[in-house]
Amino acid sequence: MHFVAVYILTHFHAYPGVAALPFFSTLPKITSCCDHYVVLNSLSSVSSSTPTCLDGEXLFQNAGQKFCRPFTDNRTIVYTMQDQVQRPWSVTWMDFNLVISDYGRAVIENLTESAMSAHKNGPRYLQMETFISDLFRYECHRDNRYVLEKKLQMFYPTTHMNELLFYPSDPTLPSPYGNGHY
């Protein structure tokens, strides 16, 4: 089944209302289960915690590899991107923690029709199962956390000539894929 990567990025903090984050921003916190939980937060720090998935939190298993549902908290990181070249409009994206949840999938499905009908050059489709599998597979290479950021760049293109929403937290680092391969 294909889903649309449509994304509103709102940022809920102690203040009321929604604030748009800058276009060049760091990645939101992502937690997954490899040999143990791996956390990539907005400070680009990696840490580990419990060695196994929490009960009921396993998404699926593949060749002995267990994939856990990422932890979520009461903060939702949202980004709003405007196309300043043509007519301005917001590209709606799902926060990763919501994307792989049942709730997130339902939201994406509901957004698909409205997004595609509102913009003739609507957002791209992606296969969520492949997205999740590849994302976790690359995230498990914990010795280079920037691979995850590059992976998000590949799977979260905007509708404007593959312009990327997410940028590496340290753009001076070489690409883990080498020679500009995304």
UniProtKB/Swiss-Prot annotation:
Glycans are attached at N74, N110. Glycosylated by host. It is found in: Virion membrane; Host endoplasmic reticulum-Golgi intermediate compartment. One of its GO terms (cellular component) is membrane. It comes from the Viruses. Keywords: Glycoprotein, Late protein, Membrane, Signal, Virion. Residues 1-20 form the signal peptide. Transmembrane segments: none annotated. Interacts with isoform gQ2. The heterodimer gQ1-gQ2 associates with the glycoprotein complex gH-gL to form a tetrameric complex. The gH/gL/gQ1/gQ2 complex binds to host TNFRSF4. Plays a role in virus entry by participating in host receptor binding at the cell surface. This is Glycoprotein Q2.
